[in-house]
Amino acid sequence: MKFVDEVSIRVKAGDGGNGCMSFRREKFIENGGPNGGDGGDGGSVYMVADENLNTLVDYRYTRHHEAQRGSNGGSTDCTGKKGEDLFLRVPVGTTVIDASTQEVIGDLVTPGQKLMVAQGGWHGLGNTRFKSSTNRAPRQTTPGKPGDQRDLKMEMKVLADVGLLGLPNAGKSTFIRSVSAAKPKVADYPFTTLVPNLGVVSVDRWKSFVIADIPGLIEGASEGAGLGIRFLKHLARTRVLLHLVDIAPLDESSPADAAEVIVNELTRFSPSLAERERWLVLNKSDMVMDDERDERVQEVIDRLEWEGPVYVISAISKQGTDKLSHDLMRYLEDRADRLANDPAYAEELADLDQRIEDEARAQLQALDDARTLRRTGVKSVHDIGDDDGWDDDFEDDEDGPEIIYVRD
């Protein structure tokens, strides 16, 4: 199944129906007067969050969506039928953006939530509306108003409580397999994970949280290298980040260097996301001797000047994973309780969330702009003149911002 998390579409609300000009005509009634009815309102376009969807692939192939036009008014004061509204179903966690102004129209974060993205046109008036004491036979009507038309960009972010960060082959997919029922692909080569994977971690019988695994980051990811930069946005709505570090890399590289790369790339992508609660998880502890393991752990802590929680685990043998899962559940419960009872804390987190969203969107927009420049053969925006044939035609733009990966 194709995983698509960004698409561009055009929506058009229905036009309003025209008013009718008609006069009453009956036997023995010489001057029956006007009886033209109003037109019907045009249908509006809504986005609806559907918890059964996890990709925007349907909108990759169908880019134009139009609601029904309102019917024209009829004689004998008959009002035209209202156009049917159009409901476009999208995954929960979808952000809808006006492509022309970059204004965020809304976020769909709860199942069943509806968002109007295009208002239907107002109905036209029939000639009955213009009857007066001085104008007994009006021949005036009004046409229906056109419905809104908008070019939209939709961005989907997975909704998870915990997000995993790390270099390729740090053991993120193995970790999510060990603590949940999710079965992402695991192999001994980089970039095994190509799309985000979600898993539900059940701690007790009635307690659970959702964890998200994204493709690994590499050095230079904030400039577009590798796969992870596109998927960092999926961590924007997580509540806590787990930074996984491989302390027994096959290439015998320094775990401290690897940990530092992730921190640097995260900070370059979004300084505010780097402020999110983050725990250090040192993986593959069963592959080194105890003395060497402790030395490598301390080296990572010293290099990062780490002061937060530290966990030493082995995901494949599940050493330390139960304690980590219980601690995460406890943190999430305490966080939710504090959010409900501490308005200042809630306001602080809301401000942080907004800054993360803004910075992530700005980074991704910059990457899209750079890709557009490369496609047109322009090295810099400063090289574009007023009449250089800059392509703003939505119809011909087959390379919108959608990114497609194939889920195994």
Curated annotation (Swiss-Prot):
Biased composition (Acidic residues): 385-401
EC number: 3.6.5.-
InterPro entries the record matches: G_OBG (IPR031167), GTP-bd (IPR006073), GTP-bd_Obg/CgtA (IPR014100), GTP1-OBG_CS (IPR006074), GTP1_OBG_dom (IPR006169), GTP1_OBG_dom_sf (IPR036726), OBG_GTPase (IPR045086), P-loop_NTPase (IPR027417)
OBG-type G domain ranges (all copies): 160-333
Cofactor(s) required for function per UniProt: Mg(2+)
Assembly behavior: Monomer.
Annotated protein name in UniProt: GTPase Obg
Gene: obg
